[in-house]
A protein has these predicted regions:
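Short beta-strand segments at enzyme active-site cores
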Residues: 17, 58-62, 111-113
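NTP-dependent small-molecule kinase module
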Residues: 69-134
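Weak global preference for isoleucine
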Residues: 13, 44, 58-59, 116, ...
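A glycine- and Lys/Arg-enriched "phosphate-lid" helix/loop adjacent to the NTP-binding pocket
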Residues: 25-94
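Short, flexible, glycine/charge-rich loop motifs used to bind or transfer phosphoryl groups or to couple energy/partner
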Residues: 2-5, 9, 47-50, 102
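Structured loop/turn residues at beta-strand edges in well-structured enzyme cores
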Residues: 9, 53, 109
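Short, solvent-exposed loop/turn segments at secondary-structure junctions
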Residues: 20-23, 64-66, 118-120
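A basic- and aromatic-enriched beta-loop-alpha substructure that forms the phosphate/nucleotide-
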Residues: 1-37, 59
């Protein structure tokens, strides 16, 4: 569907739930845990660098793994039932590492971080709108 993920005009702001860098973060975590070989990870990394278009800005919503864990428990979703704080810590650390690594490349997108603990959805949206004008 046209316009779902890509803006129709150059000045459109397009929000996606996850940054493309999450793919790298999860691949790094899987590789670190021994579930992806060096050859597989290096192949993934080459394809990642080649195929994924960089966004203009990445806005990272920062929340502690412990709070994420409590929210997952409160939602009661079956698909989240097996999550542990340790796993979420690994995802958190791997994502932050991938974001920082990605921001060191030439022509990398601007990285902005927003601490969202205690913020309501409306406040988060307002802050993102303010950040997008910077």
């Amino acid at each position: 569907e046209e316009g779902k993920f890509v803006g129709k005009n150059d000045d459109d702001i397009v929000f996606v739930e996850r940054a493309h860098v999450d793919c790298l973060a999860f691949a790094k975590l899987v590789h670190k845990n021994g579930d992806m070989s060096d050859v597989e990870f290096n192949t993934f990394r080459r394809l990642y660098d080649l195929l994924l278009e960089q966004p203009d800005v990445i806005i990272s919503l920062n929340l502690s793994p412990e709070v994420c864990f409590e929210r997952c428990k409160a939602r009661g979703r079956k698909c989240e039932a097996g999550l542990s704080v340790e796993y979420l810590n690994g995802v958190h650390n791997s994502t932050n590492s991938a974001l920082l690594e990605n921001s060191n490349y030439p022509d990398s997108p601007k990285l902005m971080t927003l601490d969202v603990l205690g913020m309501r959805t409306e406040e988060i949206v307002k802050k993102i709108e303010e950040m997008s004008k910077m």
